[in-house]
Amino acid sequence: MRLSPDTVAAERDWVRDRTPVVTLINDVRSDLGATFGVEVAPVSEADYRAEVDAVFADGDLAVNVAALVALLRDLDVEDDYPGFVVDELLGRELAGMIAGTQPLRLLGEATFHYADVSHHPEAEREGGAEPAEPAGVDDLEAALAAGFQTRLPGWDWTDGDSPFAVE
């Protein structure tokens, strides 16, 4: 793999245009909100795109996010199962990277596993048709959903200053 500013821009454009991820973000937010008994604000496509732009505006973060996106977009292992650990590892890392610094990073990583388990695009194919995309793409979508849902506003506990800040 060769990364350049043009490659990073191309991966940003792919992520930015992957707006069906917004549905997964909102499904995850709704499920987690119900689990924890809280209301979580939904995310719009405009919110998602703006946050993608924010992630890719940080060059050091952008090149690493772009590398993981490119790897997952192309990852396909014959019979898939042997590649299960690889796509989980890359997806978890991508979700954490997008989510931000601790504790958001850990929440993004944990949320990746939830999003991944609940996201089954292969089940949506008709008549057992072959997948249109490599196996890593569903993990990529779960990682994008987990990372961006974690970093975007909408969770009450992230509004305002922490009560644990010491002045």
Predicted regions located by residue number:
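Long, charge-patterned amphipathic interaction tracts in eukaryotic proteins
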Residues: 46-120
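Short, structured coil/loop segments at alpha-helix boundaries
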Residues: 18, 95-104, 129-137
